[in-house]
Amino acid sequence: MSNSLDRYVIHGGRPLHGEIEISGAKNAAVAIIPAALMVDGVCRIENMPQISDVDMLLKILQGLGARVEYLSPSAVEIDCTQVRFTEPPYDLMRKIRASYYFIGSMLGRFASAKTTMPGGCNFGVRPIDQHIKGMTAMGANVEVKNGFVYADTPDGRLHGAKVYLDKVSVGATMNIIIAATLARGRTVIENAAREPHIVDLANFLNSMGADIRGAGTDSIRIQGVERLHGGTYGVIPDQIEAGTYMTACAAAGGEVRLANVIPRHLECISAKLREMGVTVVEGGDSVLVRSNGRLRHTNVKTQPYPGFPTDMQPQISVALCLADGTSVVTEGVYDNRYKYIQELSRMGADAQVDGCTAIINGVEGLHGAEVRACDLRAGAAVVIAGLCAAGETVVTDIRFIERGYENFVGKLRSIGADIVLERDGAEQCAAAAAE
């Protein structure tokens, strides 16, 4: 895991060529790990991304008393049978937003939970009111006080309920699914989010004995079961990691094949890149991306799946900074997700932000500068900008990037990028295994 002094040093202007294998989905893994707390047996999870968020969640499980063993770099065995109710480790919980999934899993298993308010990326206001609404509907008493979430169920077990989400929320949908899995009776979530990682969470739980139907639609039905048994499950490929490399190729130029993907999960990204003049060819489990010269301008609005993902907004905005003409980007999911625009301006981008909208006037080229990763996806965006820029770009605060991208430097170097990781001033190639 990186510290605050680590940085990426990039020399841009090199087109990208080659193949990258996409890792397991971060947004699925960070919900599956807390859900494993409810499994009465040993579960083996494969295709687990090697990222710091996963490391922290596994350490939280260990802090609760679980046995966690890596069988390979991407396969982990989890045994929570000996876990007894306790408070999760504060120093880890506060660092990661996905820690809120322990509210659902602890209520499901112990009928009680005490967790910290989640940390993670520092953009926007992302309250957990819809999570609380779902837990309350299922019979929990929930109180948020002094940065902690306290929850308990007076009846000793959650009960089924009909929950209508006031807004489409991925986190709330997943947390309610987790909590409802061991609840008494039937729970229905209306206006549910439909993202691929929600389907993956449901498939994981079903493989362990849950009864969840409708995941991937806006109406999800969960019939509570008495227990979950152990088993083996493989995490789906990461839609956002794939989209990031697709956009990097589009912006920097070249031709890159992405292996181990589910092309239908990428359709919203592929369609937008095609609008910009990029060739995207879909295979059975691969996508080929080919740049065809300067990009065309277009407009982008982020929406819940199957719309254009908010987690791809910063990356596509970098590409639009180099397109011909003016593009309009509208953030329809989170507020205050444009902190990275100031960093791009330091590199010569011409973009202005007005509320939830960014007006981007394409320029001929960017120049290197020292910039910071404001959050996970903003960090990926400034790296892409560095790959396109003339001269040297230095990216600081890279700990945000390592939260969600496995072997980011190594994968980029494998397709021709000139990027190195410097730890405390000492240059590290960090890609030796890929070269």
Predicted segments, located by residue:
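Short, structured segments at the rim of ligand-binding sites
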Residues: M1-E435
